Amino acid sequence: MDKFTTLEGVAAPLKIINVDTDMIIPKQYLKTIKRTGLGKGLFSEQRYKDDGSENPDFVLNQPAYRNAKILVAGDNFGCGSSREHAPWALLDFGIRCVISTSFGDIFYNNCFKNGILPIRVSQADLDKLFDDAERGANATLTVDLASQEIRGPDGGTVKFDIDPFRKHCLLNGLDDIGLTLEKKASIDSYEAKLAERAWA
């Protein structure tokens, strides 16, 4: 998993509340267990028309936001079913940070496991970030995980809280496998001792 230290990029405003995981990645994309290639399915029912052409009104199809790295979203983002494909799709599209007032619990946990930083902020701070994001090509935000702050294009800052353990994992690029490998020396030592006591 890639480390998350400081992220600077365009922020796309998605002013929709209760975006569920079915909307993030529709069911027809759930047949794969690969984490790559799902970006094309991200918000596909909103990004594409029935004939397969792009919907120019959807934010991620607009030129300024095609390469967005940050998503500023309405309340209760990622609610619904527990599909881990939702953060996979966001990550494959290039989004590494989602900012909202609240998240679905399972989606929130899955983000951390996949190198995405979900940030909870107050409604007042979210409104401020929406204003920043709506600047289009000038909608660059900087997310500094070490200092736990979001810096806007005018230099304004928004502070956020994060669990210290999850912060450690993101800063060091540690997923569940990485956390296990951190204990490799202890595991090897334990297994060696077991081998010496095969009768036990």
From Swiss-Prot:
GO terms for biological process: L-leucine biosynthetic process. GO terms for cellular component: 3-isopropylmalate dehydratase complex. It holds the Pfam family Aconitase_C. It catalyses: (2R,3S)-3-isopropylmalate = (2S)-2-isopropylmalate. GO terms for molecular function: 3-isopropylmalate dehydratase activity. Its EC number is 4.2.1.33. Keywords: Amino-acid biosynthesis, Branched-chain amino acid biosynthesis, Leucine biosynthesis, Lyase. Transmembrane segments: none annotated. InterPro entries: 3-IsopropMal_deHydase_ssu, Aconitase/3IPM_dehydase_swvl, AconitaseA/IPMdHydase_ssu_swvl, IPMI_Swivel, LeuD. Pathway: Amino-acid biosynthesis; L-leucine biosynthesis; L-leucine from 3-methyl-2-oxobutanoate: step 2/4. Belongs to the LeuD family. LeuD type 1 subfamily. PANTHER family: 3-ISOPROPYLMALATE DEHYDRATASE SMALL SUBUNIT, 3-ISOPROPYLMALATE DEHYDRATASE SMALL SUBUNIT 2-RELATED-RELATED. Catalyzes the isomerization between 2-isopropylmalate and 3-isopropylmalate, via the formation of 2-isopropylmaleate. Heterodimer of LeuC and LeuD. This is 3-isopropylmalate dehydratase small subunit. The lineage of its organism: Bacteria, Pseudomonadati, Pseudomonadota, Alphaproteobacteria, Hyphomicrobiales.
